[in-house]
């Protein structure tokens, strides 16, 4: 379960509030890049929420390897989206400079957690949505909320599955996230 969120986007919206087409164009390009990156790693794009993205990895797999391949795919997607996002920002920065003298600083934060979730269509008779639910989803979102711009944070369950395939650095331990699953 993977969440991305743009750090500094609310301030960007405030700075460029008179130029909504610039914001919409940037967001469209970012979301398109995120979707392509997720799909390239066999992920499922769960949803866009404001400037955030939620993706699932392993939904379509049998889980024979206890989520190892899917956890690696999620981390690879995060690693691929980070420079892709930076490229999109650099291109739009040229446009934004024409409309504001303020320095604009935004970055992408990401949180990844591996765990089981209830997956399916949720909603009403007139509108439903394919999504994932449960404590592991909430935990992944909370991890993402802790990520600084440019940072990819993974839970211990994800780290245990990817450590042999992905070089990682220790960012420290976060122990005060409420409702930690398991």
Question: Can you say where each PLM-predicted feature lies in the sequence?
Answer:
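Catalytic-core segments of nucleotide cyclases and related cyclic-nucleotide turnover enzymes
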Residues: 67-71, 75, 100-102, 109, ...
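Cytosolic regulatory/linker segments at or just downstream of nucleotide-handling modules
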Residues: 117, 146-182
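Catalytic core regions of nucleotide second-messenger enzymes
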Residues: 41-49, 82-111, 181
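Alpha-helix/helix-capping structural signal
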Residues: 7, 116-117, 138, 157
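Cytosolic nucleotide-binding catalytic cores of signal-transduction proteins
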Residues: 33, 78-81, 85, 140
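Residues that scaffold the ATP/ADP-binding catalytic core of kinase and kinase-like folds
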Residues: 12, 56, 120-121, 161-162
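Catalytic cores and conserved motifs of cyclic dinucleotide signaling enzymes
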Residues: 21, 69, 128-131, 152-153, ...
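Catalytic NTP-binding/metal-coordinating core of nucleotidyl cyclase/transferase enzymes
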Residues: 1-76
């Amino acid at each position: 379960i993977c969440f991305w969120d743009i750090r500094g986007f609310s301030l960007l919206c405030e700075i460029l509030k008179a130029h909504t087409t610039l914001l919409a164009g940037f967001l469209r390009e970012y979301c398109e890049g995120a979707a392509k990156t997720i799909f390239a790693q066999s992920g499922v794009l769960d949803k866009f929420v404001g400037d955030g993205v939620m993706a699932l990895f392993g939904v379509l797999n049998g889980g024979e390897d206890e989520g190892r391949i899917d956890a690696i795919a999620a981390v690879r997607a995060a690693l691929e989206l980070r420079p892709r996002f930076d490229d999109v920002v650099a291109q739009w920065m040229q446009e934004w400079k024409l409309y504001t003298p303020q320095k604009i600083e935004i970055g992408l934060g990401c949180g990844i957690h591996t765990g089981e979730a209830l997956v399916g269509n949720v909603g009403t008779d007139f509108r439903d949505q394919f999504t994932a639910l449960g404590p592991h989803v909430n935990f992944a979102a909370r991890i993402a909320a802790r990520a600084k711009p440019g940072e990819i944070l993974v839970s211990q369950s994800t780290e245990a599955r990817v450590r042999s395939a992905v070089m990682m650095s220790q960012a420290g331990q976060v122990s005060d996230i409420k409702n930690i699953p398991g």
